[in-house]
Amino acid sequence: MDRKIEAVIFDWAGTTVDYGCFAPVQAFSEVFKEFGVTPTMEEVRKPMGMLKIDHIRTMLSMDRIQQCWQEKYDRPSNEEDVQKMYAVYEAKLLSVLDQYADPKPYVLEAVKELRLKGIKIGSTTGYTDKMMTIVTKCAEENGYRPDVWFSPDSVELKGRPYPYMVFKNMQELEVTSVANVVKVGDTISDIKEGKNAGVLSIGVIEGSSELGLSEEEYEALSQDEKDSLCKKVRTSFLEAGADAVILNMSELNEYIRKVEAR
């Protein structure tokens, strides 16, 4: 019997909006610098997709960052530091989020086609409800509005890689089986969230946090450079357990057609 996909659950920043996932990245970098530690882009992006306060905890647990912290403060970082950093981070992010809610290329077209097939649109995020109030409003003004969204606030702060936000989507959308759900994201924690939920977990390359480039930077690359970077991101997603990897949202509906025809 042919499979029928009932719902596609998208991530937000780096997946459906905010090409390159720059809003949170910029804020994390600035916060750590303010506290006297300059992180690399790799260190900032590695935990992307997690609940934002967990992201700060994860960065502080990285060997090099912790070493820099102890050199500056003569002690290890603690939870009080995490809370102070998060307060600064949240204020920074909330002040710029409205500038990072434009839908990525092919997103609106892909969502329209999904809806024409009767497929429901869900979403999960590493943002909090407070942050999402801004993002969802601006995204809707720009033409993107999923049927539902859930943040870690809705699952007792057990965000990615826990699967619970996916399950909340399924419950709200009245989906009958995890076998009929596709999760699409742009980070390793997105992939793990999908796998832990038992749904089909898809990575998207262009405009992803994993790729880490603005649209202008990406388009300025030669085809060979694009191919090389995309291959690296594809490998990262597959090694994390992705069921498939798409270049951009223009490939999503074709993937779903193939899944349903198996």
Language-model regions: role of each:
Residues 1-6, 108-112, 128-262:
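Asp-based, Mg2+/Mn2+-dependent phosphohydrolase catalytic module
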